[in-house]
Amino acid sequence: FLHGHPREIVQILSKKTSSRNFKFKKYPLIALFQDFNEYISGDIRTASLNIVICTNTKNDYEASERYQDTFLNELYPIFDLFMKHFKRSPYIQTLPGNLSYTKIDRLYWGRTGLYGNEGNIFNDFIDAIEIQNLNASFLLNCQIN
């Protein structure tokens, strides 16, 4: 798990690429992109989160191979587990049935640019599931024991 600005996440991944110990341990990855808006009302804080779940892939895969090898076998199971545990979190105040978000399957992501025309942000060949605008409410003063 990583969190931060997308460029910071890429810098961390680049450092891992240079490390013999972590070069092949970068993926699968769940990353929370910051900054995000927080709306505060009383003791409740509501945030709209942008998250990516990604794994490395082969640059010569066709879409059907990507779905079979990376999405069905790796990314979808991670997505399902992530959402299951996110909904069960005692810190989430949104009812599980009321969570709203946009899910995007990103085939061959990382070579055409992540946000607009900034160019490539991820330096690896990856397939990903992007979760946009995951709206959830949290207690303002929740503490982890």
Residue ranges and their predicted role:
Residues 79-98:
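Acidic, metal/cofactor-coordinating or nucleic-acid-engaging core segments within structured domains
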Residues 1-42, 93-100:
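Small/polar-rich, solvent-exposed N-terminal microdomains that initiate assembly or binding
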Residues 12, 18-22, 63-66, 114-123:
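Low-complexity, polar-biased intrinsically disordered regions enriched in Pro/Ser/Thr/Gly
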Residues 66-83:
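Short secondary-structure subsegments characteristic of cysteine-rich extracellular domains
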Residues 46-66:
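Short acidic, glycine/tyrosine-flanked loop/strand segments centered on an H-E-D-like triad
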Residues 28-31, 49, 134:
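A broad, low-specificity signal marking well-ordered, structured residues that form hydrophobic/aromatic
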Residues 40-44, 93-145:
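Short, charged interaction patches at domain edges and termini
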Residues 34, 53, 138-140:
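Hydrophobic side chains in beta-strands
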